[in-house]
Amino acid sequence: MTRKYFGTDGIRGTVGQAPITPDFVLRLAHAVGRVLKKSEARPTVLIGKDTRISGYMLESALESGFNSAGVDVVLLGPLPTPGVAYLTRAQRASLGVVISASHNPFADNGIKFFSAQGSKLPDVWEHDVEAALDEPPVWADSASLGKTRRLDDAAGRYIEFCKSTFANDLTLKGLKIVVDAAHGAAYQVAPKVFHELGAEVVAIGCSPDGLNINHEVGATHPQALIEAVKAHQADFGVALDGDADRLQLVDHAGRLYNGDELLYLLVDERLGRDEPVPGVVGTLMTNMAVEVALRARGVQFVRAKVGDRYVLEELEKHKWLLGGEGSGHLLALDKHTTGDGLISALQVLQACVRSGKKLAELLAEVTLFPQTLINVRLQPGQDWQVSANLASESRAVETELGAAGRLLIRASGTEPLVRVMVEARDAVQARACAERIANTLSV
């Protein structure tokens, strides 16, 4: 069944345009509250947010919607998405709610949800919510209204949780680390986590003003981090996105490592300690070099649809622990129930500290195949999937690439874009093939 409002990561859009309007968000919270009350008499939800100026307005709308359905609310303030997931589980709440549009610019915002266990919710739950949205509201009477309170030490609790995932016998003393929080949800907690584990911290992207989230900083704009690492002669650079669930890492030389490489490093570190890693989940976008390297070490590799929720579903299906995406969403289910940029960074740094090796040394076995990704903005009403020209050009490209490359064309789950990815042994060929497909889509 097609979902009307939910995309691959909750509900997202431009603030002031449907569905990201205060009236819809109030109705959404009321509908979610009614779904919760089918199985629980007095549910409690936690609400966290990133640093967008619109977060205050949407937080108020959510609070009113939940209270009007007889649901209690706990406000967490600005907090990374994985922090909300952790506290939902730790506080035994019924649901976690995050107000964020992740890596998108400040004009966008969104709403996503976590189960009582701190995991992304399945499609069937989203269908139930959309069905409730189509029904008339049932307002709670005055005696049954929900109540709201704040959890003042939410950030401190999450900081301690992150630190608990780092080995007790190791320290970050002697390391200088540049931390870029994208002027987003981790602007307070990220520098403190690394500082309290012993590192000398240089903070950038940690001065939000409501309008600058993800603007030329963070995981989607790593050049600022690269320049800062070089300028400060730092050992590492850590870049998070607006809600801190994804990671990009830079070494002392300013080389950028993406999620595919870091996923392999996490596997390698565990195998080096004789921990079993029966299998790993990537996505349709994961670089072929990672798959080849893992299979050479006897580790099964499965590709999920793009989106960390689908990686999680495959991990749970196979009962595996490690998975991720090239964008920097990494999952280690023995550490956290969802992708966490801070915890992922700590696991990578732990591998470096424990081995005494640099990132380049740890990843010497993996050389990523050249990949070209082009985003093509769709025209209103454009039905690209039925294009005969696109089908013909795609067949031609796949024939040219053969077994030494891949073509992937998919719609974005969060923006009106079609993403064209070509992977080949040769960078020039990958670029040329991707441009052929992109030009066909643009006609």
From Swiss-Prot:
Please outline how this chain is modified post-translation: Activated by phosphorylation.
**One GO cellular component from the entry?**
cytosol
Q: Which PANTHER family match?
A: PHOSPHOGLUCOMUTASE (ALPHA-D-GLUCOSE-1,6-BISPHOSPHATE-DEPENDENT), PHOSPHOHEXOSE MUTASE
Q: Could you tell me which InterPro entries the record lists for this protein?
A: A-D-PHexomutase_a/b/a-I (IPR005844), A-D-PHexomutase_a/b/a-I/II/III (IPR016055), A-D-PHexomutase_a/b/a-II (IPR005845), A-D-PHexomutase_a/b/a-III (IPR005846), A-D-PHexomutase_C (IPR005843), A-D-PHexomutase_C_sf (IPR036900), A-D-PHexomutase_CS (IPR016066), Alpha-D-phosphohexomutase_SF (IPR005841)
Residue positions, PTM Phosphoserine: S102
Task: Identify the EC number(s).
Answer: 5.4.2.10
Question: Would you say which domain of life the source belongs to?
Answer: Bacteria
Cofactor entry: Mg(2+)
- Give the protein's function: Catalyzes the conversion of glucosamine-6-phosphate to glucosamine-1-phosphate.
Q: Which Pfam families match?
A: PGM_PMM_I, PGM_PMM_II, PGM_PMM_III, PGM_PMM_IV
Q: What is this protein called?
A: Phosphoglucosamine mutase
What does the sequence similarity comment in the record state about its family? Belongs to the phosphohexose mutase family.
Q: Which organism is it from?
A: Albidiferax ferrireducens (strain ATCC BAA-621 / DSM 15236 / T118)
Any one Gene Ontology molecular-function term assigned to this protein's record: magnesium ion binding
GO terms classed as biological process: carbohydrate metabolic process; peptidoglycan biosynthetic process; UDP-N-acetylglucosamine biosynthetic process
Keywords in UniProt for this one? Answer: Isomerase, Magnesium, Metal-binding, Phosphoprotein
Binding of Mg(2+) occurs at S102, D241, D243, D245
How many and how are cofactors bound here?
Binds 1 Mg(2+) ion per subunit.
EC class, as a word, reads isomerase
Q: Which reaction does it catalyse?
A: alpha-D-glucosamine 1-phosphate = D-glucosamine 6-phosphate
Could you name the active-site residues? S102
